[in-house]
């Protein structure tokens, strides 16, 4: 059935079109689920199509936008599952998705969901972030130049550094935040999120890619 679907010239275009905000929840959700299934089993063919289809990747990225406590969060969460698989081992799609604003959208989700304490949604967003950075020098440079590595520290709840000339009360407050960081509790999900985030930081520092 997948082969027959992919043989249809406009099948994938139709699926991507169904992700539009103009369609209802069930239509968008069903299209996303089918795309996840196709990417899981026929990833290379889907990637080739997305590279040539007008607005192919942007239709997926718009699914990452969600209003709090609404059905669009379900759409967003499904899109988070699709994104890492869609860009995997394909530097061209990784670059296109990054330049269309994926980094910013993923970081917004991570912050909105509670940073590393945010559960599995944060894990999925971090997986997407890592998939865009892994072995892609262009994306690593783009992230460093437009967003910067220090932006990731607060996601771990690590306090940002203070200037050397900071007044005493600021130093005391900084020390309090450092102690809070050291004494925070680490459950299994939080550890998983932190490990993925640290891997992202390592990719940016090492700068190894294609």
Regions found by a protein language model. Give the residues of each.
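Elongated alpha-helical scaffolds that mediate protein-protein interactions in large eukaryotic proteins
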Residues: 1-16, 20-32, 37-61, 69-77, ...
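Flexible, disordered linker segments and immediate boundary regions flanking tandem C2H2 zinc-finger modules
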Residues: 108-110, 154-157, 167
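Eukaryotic Ser/Thr/Pro-rich intrinsically disordered, low-complexity regulatory regions
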Residues: 177-180
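Active-site-proximal polar cores
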Residues: 198
């Amino acid at each position: 059935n997948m082969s027959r679907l992919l043989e249809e010239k406009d099948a994938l275009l139709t699926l991507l079109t169904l992700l539009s905000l103009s369609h209802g929840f069930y239509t968008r959700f069903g299209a996303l689920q089918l795309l996840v299934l196709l990417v899981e089993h026929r990833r290379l063919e889907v990637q080739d199509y997305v590279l040539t289809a007008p607005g192919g990747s942007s239709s997926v990225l718009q699914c990452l936008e969600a209003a709090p406590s609404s059905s669009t969060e379900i759409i967003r969460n499904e899109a988070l599952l699709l994104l890492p698989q869609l860009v995997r081992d394909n530097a061209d799609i990784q670059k296109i998705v990054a330049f269309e604003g994926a980094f910013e959208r993923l970081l917004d989700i991570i912050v909105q969901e509670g940073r590393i304490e945010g559960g599995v949604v944060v894990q999925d967003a971090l997986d997407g972030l890592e998939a865009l950075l892994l072995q892609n020098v262009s994306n690593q440079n783009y992230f460093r130049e437009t967003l910067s590595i220090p932006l990731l520290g607060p996601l771990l709840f690590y306090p940002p550094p203070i200037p050397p000339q900071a007044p005493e009360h600021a130093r005391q407050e900084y020390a309090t935040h450092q102690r809070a960081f050291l004494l925070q509790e680490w459950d299994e999900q939080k550890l998983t999120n932190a490990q993925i985030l640290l891997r992202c930081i390592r990719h940016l520092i090492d700068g190894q890619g294609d």
